[in-house]
Amino acid sequence: SPALDERKPIIPQILEEDKLIHYPYESIRPFLQLLHEAACDPDVVSIKMTLYRLANHSKVVDALVEAAENGKQVDVLVELKARFDEENNIEWSRLLERAGCHVVYGIEGLKVHSKLCLITRKTKEGISFITQIGTGNYNEKTSRLYTDLSFLTASKEIGLEATEVFRALDQGETVDSVKNLLVAPHCLQNRLLNRIDGEIKAAARGEGGYIGIKINSLTDKVLINKLIEASQAGVYIDMVVRGICCLRAGVPDETENIHIISIVGRYLEHSRIYIFGQGERARYYIGSADWMTRSTLRRVEIAAPVTAPALKARLQHIFDTMLADNCNARVQQPDGSYVRRMPGADAVDCQAQFYEEAYQANVHSSLK
């Protein structure tokens, strides 16, 4: 992965600066290497992780078992209600427990769909954290087939908030509110509504309100109504929604400022990106939540702010490239139908372009 040099230890690279991995164009190997390093690092005291869907021969589980055997505290929340993976997850849970991991089996009434990993280190300088927040599962197989984003940070603030999230999960609860992370079911939908309101106010000030959203599905009525309100207030909204979409774009006086495309290509589009504002004002998030009522109110989901300038620019580039796609994109019409874009002289296949960019970055880094 160009974001992380696999030839060097991974932990110091994340301590130096935030990292973003884009699957399947970049490999999951650096993340697996990170887990293995954490399992063997004498400074690491604990590894905490939420598991939803795992590969059949999971290197993630191997690393967690190794960590427990090395005397680390390993806390794992395994979601037994993951559809089609219930049996697998029971087996993995037993294996982890036998190795000495502390396993929690989901939360009553909620499905834990968040992708969160927290590594806690204790050195002479004090406690430090490495937190990973993703849009997709810790699964080596699907990381080669689905497009997903994995954000890695050594931010103490994010690490402390992730600690709060795990503390609540361990007690069968969910956090009410933390400052930076958006955590469903209590502080994701309301934060998104606040961000949309922020863009409505920006439009009223003449600052050009803007929202960019990439998700799998859009069914949350409360968020849909707020997007319609934003469109009517003059906020321009770009959306990349692969699957179910209960909002019609381009309806005069209602959603004429909303533009929706669906991208269906070689890889399954699975990443979630939320952008609020433009230029210096823009705020970026990546996370596990679609804008569906089941995600915002009936699941534990987590989205994280991405604040490093280089990573914000990268997310904007990813989003812009998708909007420009004219090979895999279908554009939603006001009647709810979709019309396939036809590539002219300048064909843009966003997935092929991301693959090429990752390849070139890899070649460049291997020459260093």
What spans do the regions from the language model cover?
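N-terminal localization/anchoring segments of enzymes in phospholipid and broader phosphate metabolism
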Residues: S1-I211, E229-A233, C245-K368
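Hydrophobic alpha/beta core scaffold segments
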Residues: Y236-V240
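Cofactor-pocket helix-loop regions in the catalytic cores of large enzyme subunits
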Residues: N216
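NTP/phosphate- and nucleic-acid-binding module
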Residues: D220
